[in-house]
A protein has these predicted regions:
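An anionic, turn-rich surface loop/hairpin at beta-sheet edges
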Residues: 79-112
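N-terminal glycine/threonine-rich, aromatic-flanked beta-hairpin/loop signature
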Residues: 46-89
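C-terminal motif of bacterial Sec signal peptides marking the signal peptidase cleavage site
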Residues: 13-16
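N-terminal helix-cap/turn-to-beta initiation motif at the start of protein domains
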Residues: 19-34
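Short, solvent-exposed coil/turn segments at beta-strand boundaries
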Residues: 29, 57-65, 91-95, 112-119, ...
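Short, compact, well-ordered microdomains
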Residues: 109-129
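Edge beta-strand at a domain terminus
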Residues: 122-147
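Sec-dependent signal peptide recognition
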Residues: 2-10
């Protein structure tokens, strides 16, 4: 009986602490995001150190936009290509999803948390992708501001 009560209490805490995403939070997705770790369904984590690519999101006021991979350069710029995924934010049953599509595939990820510094997405395989807000890299020390 004690174990059941503990389980219910912990479950309640977990559910009540989960962030409720509001429409005004969606603009926080915009920008460059660097993956920090992936949490697998079985509970194991894969930590990421330095990443060769970032995810760049641009979501407009109509909840539509895109995601693309960019590669940061040492001078503060990014290498980009023409490949991208269209992205649409969808609210359903107190959950928030980002629906992606390319000419070849369609899929969704649940938006678990978003803030100015953190983004957490969960895919259909129940893998949680934890991102941190990324900035351009400028180690050349030329003093120039990067965009």
């Amino acid at each position: 009986m004690k174990n059941i009560v503990r389980f219910l209490f912990v479950s309640f805490l977990f559910i009540s602490c989960q962030q409720k995403i509001k429409p005004e939070d969606i603009s926080k997705i915009n920008g460059y995001w660097e993956i920090e770790k992936v949490v697998f369904d079985q509970g194991e984590d894969k930590e990421y150190g330095i990443n060769e690519s970032y995810d760049y999101f641009q979501i407009e006021n109509n909840n539509k936009g895109f995601r693309k991979k960019v590669m940061p350069q040492l001078d503060g710029t990014f290498i980009v290509n023409d490949t991208y995924e269209t992205a649409t934010v969808r609210f359903k049953d107190d959950k928030t999803f980002i629906d992606y599509s390319t000419p070849y595939a369609k899929w969704s990820e649940e938006l678990i948390a978003v803030s100015d510094k953190e983004l957490v997405l969960k895919n259909a395989e129940k893998k949680e992708y934890h991102y941190k807000k990324a900035e351009s890299i400028n180690i050349l020390g030329d003093g120039k501001k990067t965009k």
